[in-house]
From Swiss-Prot:
One of its GO terms (cellular component) is nucleus. Keywords: Isopeptide bond, Ubl conjugation pathway. This is Ubiquitin-fold modifier 1. GO terms for biological process: protein ufmylation; response to endoplasmic reticulum stress; reticulophagy. Ubiquitin-like modifier protein which binds to a number of as yet unidentified target proteins. SUPFAM superfamilies: Ubiquitin-like. Residues 97-102 form a propeptide. It comes from Oryza sativa subsp. japonica.
């Protein structure tokens, strides 16, 4: 019975999960590690990760190391349990897109 918004670490639903997110569009494969509340919406994690890597969040997706897409309409805790902590960020505008003329 943890209070909503309480900072109690280890309380059910009040813990944190960490993700190592790798930017796949960069040949050097840079990564960042984020620690977020389990109950955080994964859409917020996706948006934050994209902004940290300076790529547009509206056209980005997160996949597993096996290439499986992740539905962002779930909590960060669910994603962590289903897919683990190591994920990849892909700016979707680079996947199969033609270069736009200037």
């Amino acid at each position: 019975m943890a209070a909503a918004g309480g900072g109690g670490a280890g309380a059910a639903g009040g813990g944190k999960v960490s993700f190592k997110i790798i930017l796949t569009s960069d040949p050097k494969l840079p990564f960042k590690v984020f620690s977020v509340p389990e109950a955080a919406p994964f859409t917020a994690v996706l948006k934050f990760a994209a902004e940290e890597f300076k790529v547009p969040p509206q056209t980005s997706a997160i996949i597993t190391n096996d290439g499986v897409g992740i539905n962002p309409q779930q909590s960060a805790g669910n994603v962590f349990l289903k897919h683990g902590s190591e994920l990849r960020l892909i700016p979707r505008d680079r996947v199969g897109a033609l270069a736009a003329p200037f």
